[in-house]
């Protein structure tokens, strides 16, 4: 394809008319280069149409007349018709340095397809695929948050089957390859990341191989414990443990639970004093110190504990009723089992003698890697529904809420003590519409969603970045999309509020190209291509306009482009 600049010229776009064209050759979305003096201007074809009278406009005729001796011009003057291209200007380069597009493109400048990327590969550069419709590898600059002195937030969207999970795994692999000191916390809702890190299933890339086994996978509550007396009290209240003793009034219930917590702390202190002959302050006693033995002792003592009864009820007639219930074997057994079920979320010693880590232990691991300057930590929380036990969604939200709170607290503390360091951690929220949905119908999810939105707004300077993965932007809070500087848009968002959002953010011409993305599940398509639009500061071609890429179709192609 060859053409010449013709028609409207503006800082953001120009028109060109084709002078050479091979019938059937793809045009829309293709990258073009325009030589303008000592500058190379790169643009993208965003529209085209046939015009029957190229010389209808006086100014255009005048420009052509100046070049009437040119063979190309003579042909156009004779035909007076041609295919006009609308070209979006992306960047200008001079000697490998980006120049502002603050100059007019010369009329009749030559336009050609871009055949090779005009910049050399640099540090922190990686590839997920090729520019759409070309064989040119599309470079991305992937720097860790310590190097950048701030974190990036990512938004990845596309319908089921769009390839977003595979794309994210490739992106994480590249970040780890280029930034070995970067931390990752992955909240895995459906198990695909867990399988990739374990080397299970037939996947495009095994993250286990990339991290060479240096990662931690936790499946709450099996091997990860909650922590904190306030949270313990919250769970006791929510699970209504006192109902088994016929205690229903909120104040009475709270009094009983507070008393149980006090007795647990008191018994732990006694045990520690016996073991170490040391007095341990109450503030150093945590739920991490709970054991099954201590819990059984405290629960059994409640049967004949006058103070417990008086803490729950002030009136003697109610106290007598509670004493009677405490001595009912069936009722008391249910009460004890309810408490033990909650305690199981907090105890760190398992029945087989092995130990769990607490949420705080996991977050402290990120901090230690930063302070020591050692290799980053990669932690996967396997939050698949069938493994979260009892109150599935509610308990999953608790684990997510608590680990994100600890992460935020540690990030703020590190920043306040040492502004030269940040936590350098990327948090991946897979199936993010479960955690920060646009429409919420329960208090637990509302609290979690509000906190995540707060983190999106506040944590960049602390070195905590977020990656939101979802099927549709309209399924999550708009603030999350707006706060994400890096966006990956896969297929399936061509209608409704999602299409309107893309049009609003990227401009109406974006959809002209985006709608042409092939569906990898299309049985009539000979190539099972996975395509994405990428925008944000990680792209090289333009800092304002999105790149359109075709993702590598083979593991070998991905590895060859980035590891060889």
Model regions: which residues?
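Hydrophobic positions in the central parallel beta-sheet of the AAA+
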Residues: 185, 379-381, 427
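Conserved ABC ATPase signature
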Residues: 146-152, 161, 380-412
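Conserved P-loop NTPase motor module
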Residues: 525-564
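Helical/strand "switch-coupling" subdomains that flank nucleotide/phosphate-binding cores, especially
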Residues: 211-358
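Conserved P-loop NTPase motor cores
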Residues: 391-512
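Glycine-rich phosphate-binding loop of nucleotide-binding enzymes
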Residues: 127-217, 478, 500, 504, ...
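Basic- and hydrophobic-enriched, low-structure N-terminal and domain-boundary segments
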Residues: 1-157, 171, 421-423, 487
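The Walker A/P-loop phosphate-binding site
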Residues: 122-151, 355-385
């Amino acid at each position: 394809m060859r053409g010449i600049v013709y028609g409207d010229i503006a800082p953001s776009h120009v028109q060109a008319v084709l002078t050479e064209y091979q019938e059937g050759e793809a045009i829309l979305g293709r990258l073009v280069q325009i030589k303008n003096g000592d500058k190379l201007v790169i643009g993208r074809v965003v529209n085209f149409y046939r015009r029957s009278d190229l010389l209808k406009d006086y100014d255009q005729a005048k420009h052509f007349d100046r070049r009437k001796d040119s063979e190309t011009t003579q042909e156009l003057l004779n035909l007076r018709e041609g295919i006009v291209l609308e070209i979006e200007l992306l960047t200008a380069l001079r000697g490998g340095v980006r120049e502002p597009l603050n100059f007019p493109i010369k009329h009749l400048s030559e336009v050609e397809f871009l055949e090779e990327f005009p910049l050399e590969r640099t540090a922190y550069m990686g590839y997920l695929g090729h520019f759409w419709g070309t064989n040119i590898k599309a470079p991305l600059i992937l720097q860790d948050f310590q190097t950048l002195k701030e974190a990036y937030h990512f938004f990845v969207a596309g319908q089921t089957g769009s390839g977003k999970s595979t794309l994210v795994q490739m992106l994480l692999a590249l970040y780890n390859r280029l930034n070995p000191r970067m931390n990752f916390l992955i909240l895995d809702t459906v198990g695909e990341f867990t399988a990739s890190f374990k080397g299970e299933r037939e996947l495009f890339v095994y993250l286990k191989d990339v991290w060479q086994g240096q990662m931690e996978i936790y499946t709450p509550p099996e091997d990860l414990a909650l922590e904190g007396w306030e949270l313990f009290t919250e769970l006791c209240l929510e699970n209504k443990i006192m109902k088994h003793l016929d205690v229903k009034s909120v104040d009475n219930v709270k009094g009983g639970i507070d008393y149980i917590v006090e007795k647990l702390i008191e018994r732990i202190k006694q045990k520690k004093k016996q073991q170490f002959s040391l007095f341990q302050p109450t503030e150093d006693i945590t739920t991490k110190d709970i054991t099954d033995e201590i819990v059984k002792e405290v629960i059994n003592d409640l049967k004949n504990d006058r103070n417990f009864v008086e803490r729950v009820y002030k009136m003697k007639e109610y106290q007598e009723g509670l004493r009677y219930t405490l001595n009912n074997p069936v009722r008391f057994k249910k009460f004890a089992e309810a408490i033990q079920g909650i305690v199981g979320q907090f105890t760190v010693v398992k029945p087989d003698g092995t130990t769990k880590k607490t949420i705080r232990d996991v977050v402290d691991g990120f901090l230690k890697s930063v302070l020591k300057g050692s290799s980053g930590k990669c932690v996967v929380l396997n939050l698949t529904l069938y493994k979260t036990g009892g109150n599935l969604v509610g308990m999953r939200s608790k684990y997510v809420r608590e680990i994100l709170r600890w992460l935020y607290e540690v990030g703020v503390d590190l920043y306040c003590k040492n502004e030269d360091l940040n936590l350098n951690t990327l948090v991946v929220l897979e199936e993010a519409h479960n955690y920060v949905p646009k429409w919420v119908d329960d208090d637990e999810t509302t609290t979690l969603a509000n906190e995540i939105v707060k983190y999106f707004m506040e944590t960049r300077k602390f070195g905590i970045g977020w990656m939101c993965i979802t099927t549709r932007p309209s399924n999550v809070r708009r603030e999350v999309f707006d706060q994400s500087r890096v966006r990956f848009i896969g297929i399936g968002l061509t209608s409704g509020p999602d299409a309107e959002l893309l049009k609003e953010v990227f401009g109406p011409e974006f959809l002209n190209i985006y709608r042409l993305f092939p569906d990898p599940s299309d049985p009539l398509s000979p190539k099972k291509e996975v395509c994405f639009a990428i925008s944000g500061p990680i792209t090289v071609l333009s800092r304002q306009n999105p790149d359109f890429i075709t993702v590598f179709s083979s593991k070998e192609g991905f590895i060859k482009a980035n590891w060889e």
